[in-house]
């Protein structure tokens, strides 16, 4: 398992995949597809240019995994503020993926 990949549960029905700049694309794509198969919905969060780059590539690869089952994704990007170190607020991008 990629040590830079975090899958967290926000509540009973919602999972968020947190991507860093060092996250492996293939592993992230597999995690996205796995969560998507379970609940037809997943959030991918990335903060920083490298993390966003890795997240976008992983979403593209996950889309090809999901397409094999005759499904396609809608990707809705948005921004959130998260608390970083020393109480600094960091802006992150959240990609919300759902069925078309």
Locations of regions flagged by a protein language model:
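Short beta->alpha linker loops
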Residues: 23, 47-50
């Amino acid at each position: 398992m990629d040590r830079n990949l975090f899958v967290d549960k926000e509540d009973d029905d919602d999972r968020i995949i947190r991507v860093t700049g060092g996250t492996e694309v293939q592993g992230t794509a597999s995690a996205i597809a796995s969560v998507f198969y379970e609940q037809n919905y997943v959030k991918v969060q990335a903060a920083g240019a490298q993390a966003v780059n890795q997240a976008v590539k992983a979403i593209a690869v996950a889309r090809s995994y999901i397409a094999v089952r005759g499904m396609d994704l809608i990707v809705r990007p948005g921004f959130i503020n998260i608390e970083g170190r020393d109480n600094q607020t960091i802006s992150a991008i959240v990609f919300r993926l759902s069925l078309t």
